[in-house]
Amino acid sequence: MEPEIKIVNVVVSTQIGTDIDLEYAADILDNAEYEPEQFPGLVCRLSDPKVALLIFRSGKLNCTGAKSKEDAEIAIKKIIKELKEAGMEIIDNPVVSVQNMVATTELGMEPNLDDISTLECTEYEPEQFPGLVYRLSDPKVVVLIFGSGKVVITGLKVIEDAYIAFDKISATLKELEQELY
């Protein structure tokens, strides 16, 4: 049975121009904050889709908090439209690339994290963090496994890798269970 894997965050980046006047952009964009003494970029929060966009003077733009690449692209198009309408020189259809996706799912059981921590590529220090950190090399992702059975997969570039990672972890846990019990 396929696990129900849900994307909870997508981070993308793109280049919308060069030498962006962030003071001017902050004045024309709704919900924009620019405090260069705090952070070198302009922060703009949208409610639909619910994302945060970080725009830097260099023209680099990061979008975080999206639930899909498509949502991030919609948000970026909205910002580009506003900036262009205000007379700024902005790239029309910039190439958007996924930097990271975070997905969640459930194991469907309460794992023994102490047992799993005997495996290679795992870290488990419950005094520091309640989840077990499992680093996979193919796909190159980090899987956090919690005692409740909740799983968080981060470092994804494509959703398919979440399913591959989950299948690998599930198979490894089944093998471990057979060895131990």
Swiss-Prot record:
BP GO annotations: DNA-templated transcription initiation
sequence repeat residue intervals: 7-83, 98-173
Do you know which InterPro entries this protein is assigned to?
Answer: TBP (IPR000814), TBP_archaea (IPR033711), TBP_CS (IPR030491), TBP_dom_sf (IPR012295)
Q: Which UniProt keywords apply?
A: DNA-binding, Repeat, Transcription, Transcription regulation
Q: Does the keyword Transcription regulation apply?
A: yes
What would you give as a GO molecular function for this chain, any one?
A: DNA-binding transcription factor activity
Q: Could you confirm whether the keyword Transcription appears in this record? A: yes
Classification via SUPFAM superfamilies:
TATA-box binding protein-like (SSF55945)
Membrane-spanning residues where?
Answer: none
Database matches in NCBIfam families? PRK00394.1-2, PRK00394.1-3
For this chain, the family text in UniProt reads: Belongs to the TBP family.
Q: Tell me, what does this protein do in biology?
A: General factor that plays a role in the activation of archaeal genes transcribed by RNA polymerase. Binds specifically to the TATA box promoter element which lies close to the position of transcription initiation.
Listed name of the protein: TATA-box-binding protein
Record gene name: tbp
